[in-house]
């Protein structure tokens, strides 16, 4: 970890500049972020471009009650992704051959243009549609390009960087618990505890996939620190949905690795067991003295989610077939914010499927799910645990709308996972290198010797 920090001092310095300017000269951030992208490119620091995008998205996720002046990153992040996308579009040959992820979702992005005709906020809808497509286009190709340049050292550094983001939560806690906690729940650098939990859940899957594909990438002590950190922060978040999603992945990824049929049968059995337990859940939680941790008083109404789902379903009837354009769900929830708060609900729809339905209708939702399922089913031929990732993700999407948003610190992590499990040159890296595994040891992986465009 310390070696990583020393080796990426330029990224850390730039991040400190972002924070300083964000506090004292907010408007300058709009120019500073894209200039930083070109600075990284000029110095051939391609992983730093991707790491920078991730931390900008984390900063933009900070709520106003955490650091008021950090709100500038909510708007400025658009300029960062535009700079990253601009480099990709102008130098596409550098990234050849391109990642397959975007092509799998291309039918959805082509269709998503049509619902814009029914949008009540056309400018915002167009912006969100473009940013969504750009993320699916840019992130997988940057991940693949960085791997081609640095080999497994890139993923090693990526995991360390994502771990450092979580550990920085301790710094905020040391400054003042009001910065790191909300209503008694830990949130670290993120806007809310559920957001940090989603990040941890996705991080568990990414770190597990990378560690499985290259067993020599991390030493035992490093794995202990990485996974120990993730699990600690996941538990501290108190998020029931993300805990269950992580459990689904951790329990069944070995089943799917042995046999897809065995994994599917085990998953069905798990669902039936959950149904049996849920009918006696209140008694079980009380018996073990975990009523406060699981927020038993909010269990019956799903922390307000059931009300939000019912409210969203009523509005879906107006946009049932074709939807109202991407960001339609945000427009509706914002319009009725005062009413929703009077009913005890805060936030969005808290269900990706319903949010997507509001945005692109049942037609768009079907196309999107077809692409998502197709990607992981095909990937399972390369990485068998892909099916466990798919089912765990599908469960998580039932309780949060994170995949509907593009410029958040969650979608980008899923795109990284998609890239790792779908690209043969990553998943089959040993065959690409004449079947001889790299002996990375404790000091990390050696770069894969591959041609760089």
Predicted regions and their residues:
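Long extracytoplasmic/lumenal interhelical loops at the membrane interface
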Residues: 294-360
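N-terminal signal-anchor transmembrane segment
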Residues: 2-88, 114, 118, 393-395
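Helix-loop-helix junctions and helix-breaking kinks within/between transmembrane helices
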Residues: 18-30, 70-74, 122-128, 191-197, ...
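Transmembrane alpha-helices of multi-pass inner-membrane enzymes
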Residues: 35-41, 205, 381-384, 388-397, ...
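Aromatic-anchored transmembrane helix interface
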Residues: 73-85, 100-113, 121-144
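A membrane-periplasm/extracellular boundary helix in multi-pass inner-membrane enzymes
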Residues: 171-176, 232, 254-296, 313-318, ...
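Alpha-helical transmembrane segments of multi-pass inner-membrane proteins
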Residues: 110-114, 134-138, 152-181, 191-256, ...
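Hydrophobic transmembrane alpha-helices and their immediate junctions
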Residues: 156, 160, 217, 222, ...
